Amino acid sequence: MRPSNRTPAQTRPITITRSFTAHAEGSVLVEFGDTKVLCTASFTEGVPRFLKGQGQGWVTAEYGMLPRSTHSRMDREAARGKQSGRTQEIQRLIGRALRAAVDMKLLGENTIVIDCDVIQADGGTRTAAITGACVALVDALNWARGKGIIKANPLKFLIAAVSVGIYKGEAISDLEYIEDSAAETDMNVVMTETGKIIEIQGTAEGEPFSHEELLELLVLAKNSIREIVDVQKAALS
C-alpha cells in the first residue's frame, strides 16, 4: 500500500493554472499533489552568438528551488555563489525536452527562456517542471504569433513527464517524496503526446532492476503521461 493510498498506476491530483503571473509571455503554476512549480516563458528577439545568422531559434531553461520549498530551509544557490550539480542537470534536462518539441527554423532567430521555480517540493519536481513548462511555452509561442513576430506555429507536439519507480517491490507512478526517498528504482520519463520517448533517466537506488521491470515502468509512464497530456490540453482549451 502506498502512503497516500493511491493505486500503483495512479498519479497525484494534477492542476495547471495559466497566466499565473502578469509579466511573462507564458506563465503557469503546475501542481502535482503537494509539489508546486512556477514555470514562466520569456520570449526575446535574437539568439545566442553561436546561432547568429543561421535562421533558427533557441529554447533554454533554468531551474531553482525556493529556500523553504523543502522541509528545512536550504541556502539560496546565489548566496552559495554556484549552482549545484543537481540544478545544472535538471535545467539541462528541461531545456533538452522542450527543444525536442519546437521546430527551431519556424521559431526564427528568437529565444525562449523557461524559468522553473519550485515553490513547494514533494517529489517529482523536474517532471512537474517539464509538464508545466510545456504549457508556458505554448502560451509564449501564441503570444509571439499574435504580435506577428513569428508566422507559423513552431510547436511540433506537446510533451509531458512523470516519475516512475519500484517501491517495496512494486512498480508505481508519480512518486511523492516519501516514496522517492525509499524507492529501490527511480526513473524520470519524458514523452511526446503520442507516447514517443524523449528522455529516460533511470537509476537502481537499492536493487538492480530487470529488463522486464524496465518495460513495466515504461508502460506505466506512457499511460500516466497520456493522462497528464489530457490535463495540459484541458488547460489550453
From Swiss-Prot:
Q: Which UniProt keywords apply?
A: Nucleotidyltransferase, RNA-binding, rRNA processing, Transferase, tRNA processing, tRNA-binding
Domain of life of the source: Bacteria
Top enzyme class, one word, equals transferase
- Per the UniProt entry, the Enzyme Commission number(s) are 2.7.7.56
Q: Name one GO molecular function term.
A: 3'-5'-RNA exonuclease activity
Q: Catalyses which reaction?
A: tRNA(n+1) + phosphate = tRNA(n) + a ribonucleoside 5'-diphosphate
Q: Which residues bind phosphate?
A: R86, G124, T125, R126
Report the record's disulfide bonds.
Answer: none
Listed under GO biological process in this entry are:
rRNA catabolic process; rRNA processing; tRNA processing
Q: Pfam families recorded for this chain?
A: RNase_PH (PF01138), RNase_PH_C (PF03725)
Q: Which PROSITE patterns match?
A: RIBONUCLEASE_PH
Q: How does it assemble?
A: Homohexameric ring arranged as a trimer of dimers.
- Database matches in HAMAP family: RNase_PH
Q: PANTHER family from the entry? A: EXOSOME COMPLEX COMPONENT (PTHR11953), EXOSOME COMPLEX COMPONENT RRP41 (PTHR11953:SF0)
Q: What does this protein do?
A: Phosphorolytic 3'-5' exoribonuclease that plays an important role in tRNA 3'-end maturation. Removes nucleotide residues following the 3'-CCA terminus of tRNAs; can also add nucleotides to the ends of RNA molecules by using nucleoside diphosphates as substrates, but this may not be physiologically important. Probably plays a role in initiation of 16S rRNA degradation (leading to ribosome degradation) during starvation.
Assigned protein family: Belongs to the RNase PH family.
Name listed for the protein in its UniProt record: Ribonuclease PH
Species of provenance: Shewanella frigidimarina (strain NCIMB 400)
Q: What is the lineage of its organism?
A: Bacteria, Pseudomonadati, Pseudomonadota, Gammaproteobacteria, Alteromonadales
